[in-house]
């Protein structure tokens, strides 16, 4: 395609990035960009609290190797900041300068802004590969910035809102022939592998789909065998290196998770607005956890597909000769395969449409075990979704390539897309521009007096009912604890330490500076045992707290 009389790619990137920033502020407001504004993080979704509190305890953990370990949330078991989804790359950067930062500090708002800007910039560059009109590229980039999965994930599973990583992988794929050296190609993919882990490891398989497409096309075109695989080697090596540096393998933590098939994608995912769209009717899911595979294209993109389909029929009936859309057909064929692979991985093994389970394929262990590393396989639908989005915008521009109608159509579709999602935007704006005071169960009255001057919380059970707010109070007052909610289950380890604590209690030994916490129902089961301990006791908020007599004084 011709690239004459076009603005420079860097300028296009900057314009689209600025538009991304405008979209971010329009949806979330300015308040969350204040690093000292943390109430919205705590007084919101359970997972968002996990991310923020993980950062809080990570910054106070002394440096040691691996550098990503947190010592004070599951003491004596250290866990990686990877498993609190605290955006490890940002966590490490800000921990370096932590001595110069105030105690109340968050980087999640800034991360969201940067993500929106990069999403805008790189999507504009992606569309530039297929569309001659810079205006269409700029307008088209907004579809990516406000894509349903981005809006769904941002400030929920915040790290997963950084879907610009998928777009970067697509850019490296479609511009593969433009990259003029194997060294650059290898370095780019290596950096991407490193960044994937530094933000969220689920981006590894998504980016890898496009990387394998690069390797395949290199081989088909007769490129040198070893040099064709260098990007793949660098990507894997960089990803594994960062996992090791951040402590993903520390202490024998299993990367596998339970629930493969439960967290998949529904066959209705591209047309189901879930809670993001408002124009189309919301469709049921086979189970509530299929929200993980939400990939709603939006009313505007679906409109573009209808227009493109009508245009294709019109050209066939009128026998209008086709012009080459891309210089090499292999890209189109591989792109179709990529979309199908992404879709298949996301919907297997639980194939369902709406609330009907069509079939559940039993998977052999040799397949299920590695797939369990990415148990929320529904997320892997995003490459397919962005491929479809790119096709809708690019084919629309191609259909009207000799007129300015394409610009009008894309802008009309964008307005339709924004109208479809406006209620979701408005709801988020209201939440994130409001004040959210932080309050824990330990802040006032008898609980505050009871824990004053203590050094650690010891939970005598494995549930996560008050672990979050306890961890936040502990951060502010220099206290550690033995139980926390992580992205990977370490209940066996926590149970093991609880047995040791119970053995100490059975011997009449209470640790100085420790506050023991048990649920009221557990206390009632063995009331005589706990009452006979030489301990101070407090009963509050359906829990019982114990500490050694005179502890902390």
Give the ranges of each region predicted by the language model.
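Start-transfer (signal-anchor) and selected internal transmembrane alpha helices
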Residues: 1-34, 227-232, 317-338
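Membrane-interface coil-to-helix junctions
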Residues: 23-118, 151, 157, 161, ...
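Membrane-interface helix-loop junctions at the exits of transmembrane helices
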Residues: 25-31, 63, 138-156, 241-252, ...
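Periplasmic/ER-lumenal interhelical loops and adjacent helix-loop junctions
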Residues: 45-49, 57, 238-312
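Membrane-embedded helix bundles of polyisoprenyl
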Residues: 113, 117-129, 135-177, 185-218, ...
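Signature aromatic-anchored transmembrane alpha helix within multi-pass, membrane-resident enzymes
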Residues: 212, 233, 340, 390, ...
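Membrane-interface helix-loop-helix junctions at transmembrane boundaries of multi-pass membrane enzymes
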Residues: 222-229, 307-358
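Extracytoplasmic
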Residues: 415-495, 506
């Amino acid at each position: 395609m011709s690239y004459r009389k076009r603005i420079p790619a860097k300028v296009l990137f900057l314009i689209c990035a600025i538009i991304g920033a405008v979209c971010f502020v329009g949806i979330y407001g300015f308040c969350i960009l204040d690093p000292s504004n943390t109430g919205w993080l705590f007084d919101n979704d359970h997972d968002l609290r996990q991310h923020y509190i993980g950062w809080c305890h990570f910054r106070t953990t002394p440096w040691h190797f691996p550098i990503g370990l947190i010592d004070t949330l599951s003491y004596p078991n250290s866990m990686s900041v990877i498993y609190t989804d605290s955006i490890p790359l940002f966590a490490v950067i800000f921990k370096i300068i932590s001595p110069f930062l105030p105690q109340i500090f968050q980087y999640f708002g800034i991360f969201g802004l940067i993500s929106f800007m990069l999403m805008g910039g790189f999507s504009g560059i992606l569309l530039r590969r297929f569309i001659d009109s810079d205006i269409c590229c700029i307008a088209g980039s907004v579809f990516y910035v406000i894509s349903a999965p981005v809006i769904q994930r941002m400030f929920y599973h915040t790290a997963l809102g950084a879907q610009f990583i998928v777009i970067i992988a697509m850019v490296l794929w479609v511009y593969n022939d433009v990259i003029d050296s194997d060294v650059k190609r290898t370095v780019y993919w290596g950096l991407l592998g490193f960044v994937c882990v530094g933000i969220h490891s689920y981006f590894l398989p998504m980016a890898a789909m496009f990387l394998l497409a690069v390797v395949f096309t290199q081989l088909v075109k007769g490129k040198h065998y070893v040099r064709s695989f260098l990007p793949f080697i660098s990507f894997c090596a960089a990803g594994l290196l960062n996992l090791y540096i951040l402590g993903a393998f520390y202490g024998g933590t299993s990367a596998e998770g339970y629930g493969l098939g439960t967290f998949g994608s529904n066959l209705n995912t591209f047309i189901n607005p879930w809670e993001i769209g408002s124009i189309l009717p919301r469709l049921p899911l086979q189970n509530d956890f299929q929200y993980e595979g939400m990939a709603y294209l939006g009313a505007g993109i679906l409109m573009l597909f209808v227009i493109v389909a009508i245009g294709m029929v019109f050209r066939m009936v009128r026998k209008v000769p086709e012009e080459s859309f891309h210089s090499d057909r292999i890209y189109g064929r591989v792109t179709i395969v990529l979309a199908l692979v992404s879709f298949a991985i996301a919907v297997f093994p639980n194939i369902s449409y709406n609330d009907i389970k069509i079939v559940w394929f039993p998977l052999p262990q040799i397949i299920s075990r590695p797939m369990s590393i990415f148990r929320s396989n529904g997320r892997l639908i995003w490459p397919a979704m962005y491929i479809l989005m790119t096709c809708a915008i690019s084919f629309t521009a191609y259909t009207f390539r000799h007129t300015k109608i394409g610009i009008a159509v894309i802008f009309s579709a964008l307005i339709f897309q924004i109208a479809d999602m406006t209620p979701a935007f408005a709801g988020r704006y209201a939440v994130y521009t409001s004040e959210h005071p932080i309050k824990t169960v330990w802040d006032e009255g008898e609980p505050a007096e009871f824990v004053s001057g203590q050094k650690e919380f010891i939970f005598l059970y494995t549930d996560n009912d008050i672990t979050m707010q306890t961890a936040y109070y502990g951060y502010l007052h220099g206290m550690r604890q033995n139980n926390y909610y992580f992205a990977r289950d370490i209940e066996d380890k926590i149970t093991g330490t609880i047995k040791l604590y119970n053995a100490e209690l059975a011997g009449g030994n209470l640790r100085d500076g420790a506050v023991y916490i048990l649920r009221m129902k557990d206390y009632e089961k063995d009331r005589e045992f706990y009452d006979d301990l030489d301990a101070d006791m407090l009963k509050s908020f359906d829990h019982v707290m114990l500490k050694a007599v005179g502890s902390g004084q």
